[in-house]
Amino acid sequence: EKVSKYYSACLFEHALHLPLCTDAKIAEQFSLHLAEEIDGVVMPTIVYGYKSKPLSGGGPLFPGTIDLNGNTLIYLVHDILMELIRDGFTKIFIMNAHFENEAFVVEAMDLVNRETNGAATIVESNWWDPMPEDVIDLIFDKVPFPGWALEHAAVTETSLMLYFAPELCKMDRTVDVVSTNALPYFRYPLKKDDVPESGALASCAYSSAEKGKVIVDKVLPELVNICKKEFNL
């Protein structure tokens, strides 16, 4: 019995050097790699996601950033899960690559679980959640780790994109920035100077395809272990 895998991401600015589809591409590639390891079936991506917060994903201030409302994302994920279960899938793994999606994805999982009386085991993970702690030291050997909220279009995402899809990276357009200071509150309306003009929240200096490979090589076995445990593979 195969595991159905699909991934939620978004179309959001990722500074000047990475494409709008960065989150979708990273989630897709992790899903494809994982599917090879567990003989899974990979569904098409959900390319639109919930609103990005200014100091974790750059916010909605940039052209090309396409946002969904929370209810829209909940019922989009809900309906896809219901269709997969109707088609006979009982083991479903959701690979998330956009932090702000998670609460709404989990809400959809909860609704589906109630409506189907637990007919399927549904697992969700952000690609960075199972990352072993020692990987941070390996990746951030020359610059400090700014925290996951500010690691937007910075070292990890840039390194993963250089590994997964170097043809989509424009490294001549990188802008070295000092890590943005996270605010302890949110405010509406948003202001143009809430985030740097480049959209980057931390430096991507010293990113490389080699570091991207290190991340994949360390995270992929952890994802496999999650699937083996939860799906009894």
Q: Predicted regions span which residues?
A:
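Extended, histidine- and acidic-residue-enriched regions that form the cofactor-binding/catalytic faces
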Residues: 1-92, 97-233
